[in-house]
Design a protein with these regions (language model features):
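Multi-pass membrane catalytic core of lipid/isoprenoid biosynthesis enzymes
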Residues: 41-70, 146-156, 164
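Hydrophobic alpha-helical membrane-embedded segments
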Residues: 8-23, 90-116
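Hydrophobic alpha-helical segments of integral membrane proteins
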Residues: 28-43, 76, 114, 129, ...
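Conserved small/polar residues in nucleotide/adenosyl-binding loops
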Residues: 16, 188-194
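N-terminal transmembrane-helix/juxtamembrane module of multi-pass inner/ER membrane proteins
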Residues: 18-57
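Juxtamembrane "helix exit" motif at the C-terminal ends of alpha-helical transmembrane segments
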Residues: 2-4, 65-82, 167-183
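Hydrophobic alpha-helical transmembrane segments
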Residues: 81-93
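Polar-ligand-bearing catalytic/cofactor-coordination segments
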Residues: 106-174, 185-190
Length: 198
């Protein structure tokens, strides 16, 4: 079990370095975002308390759905009776799924695009690239604030897209990594000023 988990982490990291995050509607994080977007209209309310309760129910629903799906998948794999087949299937699926919770290459790509634009003294391009990885308005940021924004984003996303998923995977397996991602995606979707809970 421990060897299997180590192999899964190794292959997931290798996949991230080789492939990165393909932009696709079939990415599990995109599915989580769509589920949240589907549930948000039911939570909107003029009462702040009711909207807060609605947001909590959305997060609870998303965590429950993600948890059930991943526990079910792990149970299905455990039913395979041939040990080597079970190991191969578990490592293959586990690596691919765990990779979808990790975003090292994608963050590196976006952060370097900002830094490269700053080094070329193209602050408009740097602001544009930065706007893809931060929530704040970047239109009037100077060079120091642009670099500060990149550093802040890389720091936050190191936790959200690397150490967090791996930590929860180490303790709870794939369900833990995915529930963690579901919580971080929920936070992002539910705290945008135009959506809910702000």
């Amino acid at each position: 079990m421990i060897l299997e988990s180590i192999v899964i982490v190794g292959f997931a990291l290798l996949l991230d370095f080789l492939v990165g995050d393909p932009k696709t509607k079939y990415h599990p994080t995109a599915w989580i975002g769509k589920l949240i977007a589907l549930l948000v209209p039911f939570a909107k309310n003029n009462s702040v308390k009711r909207e807060l309760i609605g947001g909590i129910l959305i997060v609870g629903t998303v965590i429950t759905v993600v948890g059930i799906l991943l526990v079910g998948l792990e149970f299905g794999i455990s039913l395979l009776t041939i040990d080597i087949v079970s190991f191969i299937v578990s490592v293959a699926l586990g690596s691919i799924l765990l990779k979808t919770t990790i975003a090292i290459r994608g963050m590196q790509k976006h952060a370097l695009a900002v830094v490269d634009a700053v080094e070329k003294e193209d602050l408009d391009l740097a602001r544009n690239h930065l706007s893809m990885i931060v929530k704040r308005d970047t239109k009037n940021l100077d060079k120091n604030h642009i670099l500060s924004g990149v550093l802040e984003s890389v720091s936050e996303n190191t936790v959200d897209g690397i150490t967090g998923p791996l930590f929860y995977y180490a303790i709870f397996g794939l369900p833990g990594a995915f529930v963690y991602r579901a919580v971080t995606v929920s936070y992002t979707h539910l705290t945008l000023p135009t959506i809910l809970l702000v």
